[in-house]
Amino acid sequence: MESEGPPESESSEFFSQQEEENEEEEAQEPEETGPKNPLLQPALTGDVEGLQKIFEDPENPHHEQAMQLLLEEDIVGRNLLYAACMAGQSDVIRALAKYGVNLNEKTTRGYTLLHCAAAWGRLETLKALVELDVDIEALNFREERARDVAARYSQTECVEFLDWADARLTLKKYIAKVSLAVTDTEKGSGKLLKEDKNTILSACRAKNEWLETHTEASINELFEQRQQLEDIVTPIFTKMTTPCQVKSAKSVTSHDQKRSQDDTSN
């Protein structure tokens, strides 16, 4: 079962809806803001079918405003996706992602859905977001990644998962970097030998295939795969960038003259 949330309130930086209000406003009773958002209840309870009816059934009274209702923000810039994350409703996140919402949107202080799920210890929601390719390197106003927020709130399982996701991303990015470097050499003055080029591209393909077939690989295994690829490509690129020692015409002539003199003396 997932954690019930941060051990402390994020009051002034994340979860407070009265952030930076003056004393007079804080003392006032909250005003009625209109009818309750019809998406809220199904989002919090995991009623995916109910949400789909609103988004996909033209006869539903809220159909035309569905996206607007979903993206309505509170005072700190959170929409209903954040509520779903806090509630640990992973299936809701997956379902709503199909409607083209931006899963990397930030609050006024730079928190993403991933930061939110990490703070609340919603491991399954973190997994869903990572599967949906959210930016795991996004920073909040404290320059914290989601992993750092999870650590701050002692969400150990979330920290471990995000470390694993980071190791996987590191390998993916290195493969992409190497592949791009091969393409760039074709445009520049220093070109790879055909054999070397094929060796590198073949190694990159092999590592991508390994990633696809080893979805549960450990952090150590991911690091090992990167090291193996690095051991293949580094000597090749080093060889390509090392200048050849070509003899100048003057040195060749001088060498030939010396050799001729030696032959004469003999």
Swiss-Prot record:
GO biological process: one example? cell population proliferation
Annotated organism of origin: Homo sapiens (Human)
Q: Which InterPro entries match?
A: Ank_Repeat/CDKN_Inhibitor, Ankyrin_rpt, Ankyrin_rpt-contain_sf, HSP70_C_sf
Q: Where in the cell is it found?
A: Cytoplasm; Midbody, Midbody ring; Cleavage furrow
Coiled-coil residues: none
Which residue stretches does the UniProt record annotate as biased composition, category Acidic residues? Answer: 1-11, 18-32
Region feature Disordered, mapped onto this chain: 1-43
Keywords in alphabetical order: ANK repeat, Cytoplasm, Repeat
The record's Gene Ontology cellular component field reads: centrosome; cleavage furrow; cytoplasm; cytosol; Flemming body; midbody; plasma membrane
Q: What is this protein called?
A: Ankyrin repeat domain-containing protein 45
Show me the ANK repeat boundaries. 76-105, 109-138
Disulfide pairs here are none
| Role description | May play a role during cell division.
Q: State the Pfam families in the record.
A: Ank_2 (PF12796)
